[in-house]
């Protein structure tokens, strides 16, 4: 049997996509809308407190296109906490005017493909910890997509020897490093959690960089031979102070 890559696992992640039922929302009185938005902002304030305590992170995004209107991205130490937050939101007044369109459950992951030899506990390394337990950047734009490694005929990633996979991932990673400071990415593993094997979340202040990065990686062997991709979602950061304006009728 081939050697499996070892992973370091951090916070659990929920990407929650919703459409807004604008027609129904328009029928609600201004005072009721205000009450529901106040309730939602109170939930977001609670999430902010968790983030300040270093026990999780979150961000809201306005999604472009018809796949969804809103994406809520949540990171927490346990799957139970994600479930509690999801249930609390579903019981809120605002959620009654939202239609779930997609969700993705995963855990922030670092693999040993690019790791060097060291006897230290990686969970005590500040750099590693910052990647496993990240505070989501408040950059202008987000791009999310799920992906698999292909398992077909001669293009079976899981049948390649470990050293070959390491070399391929090293080359693949060099492309990403070329976008350091321009694009931040969070890779989250979802084998056994969701329908794809990984979720990729990209952040940037220049939305065009998503296209440039993904296109350049298409020519790398890891993507060209072994990558399979799901739907792409792109959107813009929705800060708490902009929530009332976003839902204003």
From Swiss-Prot:
- Its domain of life reads Bacteria
Q: Does the keyword Cell membrane apply?
A: no
Q: Which residues form the active site?
A: 145
What keywords were assigned to this record? Heme, Heme biosynthesis, Iron, Metal-binding, Oxidoreductase
According to UniProt, the reaction catalysed is:
Fe-coproporphyrin III + 2 H2O2 + 2 H(+) = heme b + 2 CO2 + 4 H2O; Fe-coproporphyrin III + H2O2 + H(+) = harderoheme III + CO2 + 2 H2O; harderoheme III + H2O2 + H(+) = heme b + CO2 + 2 H2O
Q: Copy the pathway line from the protein's UniProt record.
A: Porphyrin-containing compound metabolism; protoheme biosynthesis
* Matching Gene3D superfamilies: Apc35880, domain 1 (3.30.70.1030)
Biological process, per Gene Ontology: heme B biosynthetic process
Specify whether 4Fe-4S is a keyword of the entry: no
What enzyme class is recorded for this protein?
A: oxidoreductase
Q: Which InterPro entries match?
A: CHDC, ChdC/CLD, Dimeric_a/b-barrel
Give its E.C. classification number. 1.3.98.5
Q: Which residues form the signal peptide?
A: none
Q: Which cofactor does it need?
A: Fe-coproporphyrin III
Record GO terms (molecular function): heme binding; metal ion binding; oxidoreductase activity, acting on the CH-CH group of donors, oxygen as acceptor; peroxidase activity
The record's section on HAMAP family has: Coproheme_decarbox_1
Per its database record, what is this protein's job? Answer: Involved in coproporphyrin-dependent heme b biosynthesis. Catalyzes the decarboxylation of Fe-coproporphyrin III (coproheme) to heme b (protoheme IX), the last step of the pathway. The reaction occurs in a stepwise manner with a three-propionate intermediate.
Protein family per UniProt: Belongs to the ChdC family. Type 1 subfamily.
What's the protein called, per UniProt? Answer: Coproheme decarboxylase
